[in-house]
């Protein structure tokens, strides 16, 4: 995976949305967006995989992965421009894809504040937390 973008003091709370705009690198077979407490504790691992034509969402606690949730709605491709919105709610995350389709993923770890954001495989043009 190409270089990563990281924020370690995010302060995202329920009711807030993260809006990401960027371009997927041309030479990747997947990209990722992680939200959580740190590298080892991820409340949301969002991972579109071009080589599998699927979007994988998961959690990681202490470096141990949970059960994958797979969605066969692939609206991404290498080199494409993307706009993704992730809304953090008490019990789940709503991810709005570039074509307007929404995915829901449960907040399995139950945290009410997220401190960590990382992204890979994307050239970020903007991100906004509101």
From Swiss-Prot:
Start and end residues of each Galectin domain: 4-130
One Gene Ontology term, aspect cellular component: galectin complex
Protein keywords: Lectin
SMART domains: Gal-bind_lectin, GLECT
Keyword Metal-binding assigned: no
PROSITE patterns: GALECTIN
Database matches in Pfam families: Gal-bind_lectin (PF00337)
Subunit structure, as described in the record: Homodimer.
Role summary: This protein binds beta-galactoside. Its physiological function is not yet known.
Identification of the protein by name: Galectin-2
Organism: Mus musculus
């Amino acid at each position: 995976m190409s270089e990563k973008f990281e924020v370690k003091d995010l302060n995202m709370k329920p009711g807030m949305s993260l809006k990401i705009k960027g371009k997927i690198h041309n030479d990747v077979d997947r990209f990722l967006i992680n939200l959580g407490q740190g590298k080892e504790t991820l409340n949301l691992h969002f991972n579109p995989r071009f080589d599998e034509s699927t979007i994988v969402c998961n959690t990681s606690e202490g470096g141990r992965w949970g059960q994958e949730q797979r969605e066969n709605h692939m609206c991404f491709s290498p080199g494409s421009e993307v706009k993704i919105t992730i809304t953090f709610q008490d019990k789940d995350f709503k991810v709005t894809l570039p074509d307007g389709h929404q995915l829901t993923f449960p907040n399995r770890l139950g945290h009410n504040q997220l401190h960590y954001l990382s992204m890979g495989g994307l050239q970020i043009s903007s991100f906004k937390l509101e």
